[in-house]
Amino acid sequence: MTTVEQDAVGTSGYRVELLPGIDSLPRAAWEELAPGDDPMWSRGLFSAMEHSRLGPDGYAYLVVRRGAAVAAVLPLCLFRELRLDQVVGSRERRLLAPLARVLPRLLRVPMLFCGNLLGQGHVLAPGPPGEEVCRLLVSAVLDVARAERLGTVVFKDFAPDELDPLRTALEQAGFFFVRSLPDTRLRLGQASFEEYLTALPAKPRRNARSKIRAFRARPGLRLEVLDDFDHLLPELLGLYQQVMARAEQTLDVIDASFLADVQGRDDPRRRLVACFEDDRLVAFLLCFFAGSGATGARIGLDYRIAHDARLYHNVHYEAIRLAIASGCRHIRFAQTAYQPKLELGCDLVEQWYAMTHLRPLPRAALRRLLPPALSAALDRALGPHAPGRPPTEKGSARATG
C-alpha cells in the first residue's frame, strides 16, 4: 500500500492512500459506497477492466480514510501512450492524419482519467464529499499525475451534482470545465413492452412498430437472450470491431479478455441480447444489471444487413423488453447515436469534464482550444438537441440531471 505523501493528512484526521487495484479495497466498503443501481460501478466490472486490455496502462484508487472508516474513493486510469487521434471525432482525426503519419509522437498525450472509464463519473462517498475531502482528493490526483508524468488530468463524465462539491477545489487547482457528451437514460416502470410502445409519442411509436415489422419480415432472423455466451466470443468481437471501425472515438475498446472475464462472473449480472440470421450471429447488445438499473453497454452489428433488417433498433427494443421484465426503473445506453435513442424515449443526462495540465503553457492552450472544439463536436453529435448555453458557463441548466 502506497501513501500519497503531499497533503496526505488533513486537519480533521483524514489521510489519503493510493491503492494499486480493486482487490486492495475492502469489498464491503466498495459495495456500501458504489451506486447500487448502476451496474457499470459493480466491483466485478472494475476487476474485469483491470484484467483486460481496454486501453489504460494502469489502474489505481485514491482512498480517503478517517480512522478506520472510508470517507471517499476515486478510481484512476493511467494512459501513458494515449494518442490524440483516439479521443477526437472523425473530422478532427482526418485533419490530424498527416501529422500521425509523419510525426506520430507529437500526438502522444499522457493522461490521467479520474472516475469510471466505462461509465458516469462519481466520487464514491456516503454523501456529498466535504470541502477537506475534496481538497485532499484533488491534491492527491495531481500528485499521482506528477509522479507518473501524466501531463493532462481529466475528471471524466461527471454529472453537475457530482461535480459541484469538487468545483472549488478543482478551480483552485487550475482545472477548467467543459461539457462532455451526455449519457442516455430511458425511464421505465411500464408493466410490459407493449405498454412502453403505447406510451411513446405518435411518430416514434409508428417508427418503432415499422422497424419491428421490417425485422420480423426478414427470413431467418431471430432474437435470443443468453446468459452463457462463451461459445460466441470470436463472433462477438468481430461484430464489435465492425462498430468500432466506424466509431467517433476509440478511447476504451473492449477485447476478448474483457468479454471472457465478464462471461465468467456473476457480478454484475449480465445478459446478451443476440440476433441470429439462421445460425450466424449478426448483432448483439451486451447488457448489465444492478438493483433497479440496467445498461446496454456494448453493441456489435453486421453492417451487411444492419440497415435493411433494422438490427440496431431491434436489439435495443429487446434490451428494453428485458429490463422491463427484470423490474428495472431505468436503462442507460452508450454516448453515441443520439437520434435513435431519443426516439426510444431516452433523456439526455448532462455530463462534464474537469481538465487541467500540469504545466502552465499547455494548460493555457487547452483552456483556449478545447472548449470550442468540444462544443463543436457536441453540436455535431446532438444536432438540434445540442445545449443552447456555452459549455464553459457555470450553473448551466441540466438536460435531465
PLM segments and residue spans:
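Active-site/acyl-donor-binding loops of N-acyltransferases
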Residues: T2-G13, L78-F79, Q120, A169-E195, ...
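A conserved beta-strand-loop-helix scaffold within acyl/acetyltransferase catalytic domains
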Residues: V9-E92, L142-D143, G151-H307, R398
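Proline-rich intrinsically disordered, low-complexity coils
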Residues: P20, P26, P35, P39, ...
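Low-complexity, flexible helical/coil segments
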Residues: S52-G55, L96-R101, V109-F113, G189-F193, ...
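Acyl-donor binding region in acyl/amide transferases
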Residues: D57-A60, R65-R66, C77-F177, G293-Y353
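Hydrophobic alpha-helix feature that most strongly marks membrane-spanning transmembrane helices
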Residues: Q241-E248, Q263-D267, R280, L286-C287, ...
